[in-house]
From Swiss-Prot:
One of its GO terms (molecular function) is translation elongation factor activity. Belongs to the TRAFAC class translation factor GTPase superfamily. Classic translation factor GTPase family. EF-G/EF-2 subfamily. GO terms for cellular component: cytoplasm. This is Elongation factor G. PROSITE patterns: G_TR_1, G_TR_2. It comes from the Bacteria. SMART domains: EFG_C, EFG_IV. One of its GO terms (biological process) is ribosome disassembly. Coiled coil: none annotated. Catalyzes the GTP-dependent ribosomal translocation step during translation elongation. During this step, the ribosome changes from the pre-translocational (PRE) to the post-translocational (POST) state as the newly formed A-site-bound peptidyl-tRNA and P-site-bound deacylated tRNA move to the P and E sites, respectively. Catalyzes the coordinated movement of the two tRNA molecules, the mRNA and conformational changes in the ribosome. Keywords: Cytoplasm, Elongation factor, GTP-binding, Nucleotide-binding, Protein biosynthesis. Gene3D superfamilies: 3.30.230.10, 3.30.70.240, Elongation Factor G (Translational Gtpase), domain 3 (3.30.70.870), P-loop containing nucleotide triphosphate hydrolases (3.40.50.300), Translation factors (2.40.30.10).
């Protein structure tokens, strides 16, 4: 099969926004105008096509980023047909992992803002992620029909809050209830969409007289922003010559691709106005796969490799999402960076070093599927039934293996114990958790060796709520949830010498006798965690009993004498003891060793260690005092701050036990405008008062 759409006419874009900016409605309208969907879905009645998981429809928030393919030739059919792959990204802070993942596979993004609420906190987090992956973007100010809508205020906020160089491409005609349409500042014409056919058709009209001056002023700003693309345009602009429409658009495109400006459109998706012109802007200003740098990767011999967006290069694709579909099982969403693959072909998973067969390939339209025979560079599609592919794996040609950059997934920050309500739920729960962990790399499952409980960990309280909710709905598993937990450790601070342990029983018949003398000493934290040194001379303890001494001590390490937590960073030197020809046995020496260890541990200045997290908070400057004050109350050690005019980054080390509920507290302190990340850093000694409280609580159990 030949390529149907040249790769230069592809646009892989994400639609990304704060919760409630109307992103899903905007995506819906894109599907409607591009002719994919014949009935408009409204989020208000839970019927949007992009939000396809039950909970999303109930909660009215987007959780799974669905990828959809649509075609567009422009409002006035002025372009050749372009293929737009839309990736809908979630806007909630607990799902930033999904946003980050979709940022990897996008070439450009449309940032949707609410004309009333403006640039919201989550928009700042998403913006930082888009900066990290250098994604060119345009903005769409939605909800112009709402009370309190103010387009130019949002254009300003993109500058002041996000540091984005925003330029208005349009001005709204009227606002709130009187929102009629927009003025195209390049053509200097008013666009009036036809309400009778839900905005499918429109007319160009003259700009209302009372807006002419404002439009001319804004157009001058737009043209100047375009002229800065090159010296010759600057000369033309300053000598008073008019730039042609073509020159303006080419120059704006050049600056958007270089991430130097953010063109801003406006409209009301709900009222069917503005999305059509925004789609034109996607084609005019956002990059095709061939406009962005070749994706980098690592070759088999550890050298750096790359893949250009071309059908002629070896096949390379990145799996960016795994979803479970009720009818076909596993769907692996992937983005093809280079080459061509047909259904039935075998590909190589270079991360897991396994071969996979591409059985069926489908292109998704929200929650409907169309089966296709091949995919080419630039395509986004889903494969059905791949066996062992995880998020972030590379699928490539076996004769040209490459690992495209691994995605970095943040460490989970909160853990809770889950237990099935009935015996029947027990088996189903294991299966359900395994499936959910495969879909979502920021969610982990493990069994606590000390308590035997199943522990689930994730990115926040909402994240784990939704996991438990999905277990109930999709896998019909009912479970009880425990309280968030912290894993402590025990160790010693001083060396004790010549501690004796003796196990002797003479009760008629064969007795038991084991006798050891040990030294116990602390080890460096970064070391092996435990060492056993045998210094027995002259056979005072026969060689066959030495391993039993080591084993007896290791069994004690699993549950420390202080509060039953694992013991780390201790060394034992066995240097004396005695035995009995008849009564000594491995068991007797094991018991003697454990008695000696317990006795020595109590004298070696035992302490409790707690996990310390490396915490980074990014907050607007206005809230720095509150954030630092709150961190200090959480026993934080603040290591420093980096600031620019939009955001202050605070680095701190905080005990994990003090971080529960932090996301909620931080949101309320900063009106939701700050974000934070944390990862495990080290174990450190817990202050006496804290340690005593923990030890008392454990004893009470």
């Amino acid at each position: 099969m030949a390529r149907t759409t040249p790769i230069s006419r592809y646009r892989n874009i994400g639609i990304s926004a704060h919760i409630d900016a109307g992103k899903t409605t905007t995506s819906e309208r894109i599907l409607f105008y591009t002719g994919v969907s014949h009935k408009l879905g409204e989020v208000h009645d839970g019927a949007a096509t992009m939000d396809w998981m039950e909970q999303e429809q109930e909660r009215g928030i987007t959780i799974t980023s669905a990828a959809t393919t649509a075609f567009w030739s422009g409002m006035s059919k002025q372009f050749e047909q372009h293929r737009i792959n839309v990736i809908d990204t979630p806007g909630h802070v607990d799902f930033t992992i999904e946003v980050e993942r979709s940022m990897r596979v996008l070439d450009g993004a449309v940032m949707v803002y609410c004309a009333v609420g403006g640039v919201q906190p989550q928009s700042e987090t998403v913006w930082r992620q888009a900066n990290k992956y250098q994604v060119p973007r345009i903005a769409f100010v939605n909800k112009m029909d709402r009370t309190g809508a103010n387009f130019l205020r949002v254009v300003d906020q993109i500058k002041t809050r996000l540091g984005g160089n925003s330029v208005a491409l349009q001005l709204p005609i009227g606002s709130e209830d009187n929102f009629k349409g927009v003025v195209d500042l390049i053509k200097m014409k008013a666009i009036n969409w036809n309400e009778a056919d839900q905005g499918m058709t429109f007319t160009y009209e003259d700009i209302p007289a009372d807006m002419l001056e404002a439009c001319e002023e804004r157009r001058a700003m737009l043209v100047e922003a375009a002229a800065e693309a090159s010296e010759e345009l600057m000369e033309k602009f300053f000598s008073g010559e008019e730039l042609t429409e073509e020159e303006i658009k080419t120059a704006l495109r050049q600056r958007v691709l270089a991430n130097e400006i953010i063109p801003v459109c406006c409209g009301s998706a709900f009222k069917n106005k503005g999305v059509q012109a925004m789609l034109d802007a996607v084609i005019e200003y956002l990059p095709a796969p061939t406009d962005i740098p070749a994706i980098k990767g690592i070759n088999e011999d550890e050298t750096e490799g790359e893949r250009h967006a071309s059908d002629d290069e070896p096949f390379a694709a990145l799996a960016f999402k795994i979803a479970t579909d009720p009818f076909v099982g596993n769907l692996t969403f992937f983005r093809v960076y280079s080459g061509v693959i047909n259904s039935g072909d075998t590909v190589y998973n270079s991360v897991k070093q396994k071969r996979e067969r591409f059985g069926r390939i489908v292109q998704m339209h929200a929650n409907k599927r169309e089966e296709i025979k091949e995919v080419r560079a630039g395509d986004i599609a889903a494969a059905i039934g791949l066996k062992d592919v995880g998020t972030g794996d590379t699928l490539c040609a076996q004769d040209a293996p490459i690992i495209l950059e691994r995605m970095e997934f943040p460490e989970p920050v909160i853990s809770v114990a889950v237990e099935p309500k009935t015996k029947a739920d027990q088996e189903k729960m294991g299966l359900a958790l395994g499936r959910l962990a495969q879909e979502d790399p920021s969610f982990r499952v493990h069994t606590d060796e000390e308590s035997g409980e199943t522990i689930i960990s994730g990115m926040g309280e909402l994240h784990l709520d939704i996991i438990v909710d999905r277990m109930r709905r999709e896998f019909k598993v009912e479970a009880n949830i425990g309280k968030p937990q912290v894993s402590y450790r025990e160790t010693i601070r001083t060396t004790v010498k010549d501690v004796e342990g003796k196990h002797a029983k003479q009760s008629g018949g064969r007795g038991q006798y084991g006798h050891v003398v040990i030294d116990l000493y602390p080890l460096e934290p970064e070391g092996p965690g435990y060492e056993f040194v045998n210094e027995i001379k002259g056979g005072v303890i026969p060689g066959e009993f030495i391993p039993a001494v080591d084993k007896g001590i290791q069994e004690q390490l699993k549950s420390g004498p202080l509060a039953g937590y694992p013991v780390v960073d201790v060394g034992v030197r066995l240097h004396f003891g005695s035995y009995h020809d008849v009564d000594s046995s491995e068991l007797a020496f094991k018991l003697a060793a454990s008695l000696a260890f317990k006795s020595a541990f109590g004298r070696a200045n035992p302490v409790l260690l707690e996990p310390i997290m490396k915490v980074e908070v990014e907050t607007p400057p206005d809230y720095v005092g509150d954030v630092i004050g709150d961190l200090s109350r959480r026993r934080a050690m603040v290591n420093g701050q980096e600031a620019n005019e939009f955001v202050v980054k605070i680095n701190a080390e905080v005990p994990l036990s003090e971080m529960f509920g932090y996301a909620t507290d931080l949101r309320s302190q900063t009106q939701g405008r700050a974000s934070y990340s944390m990862e495990p850093l080290k174990y450190a000694e817990a202050p006496t008062s804290v340690a005593n409280a923990i030890i008392e609580a454990r004893k009470a159990k």
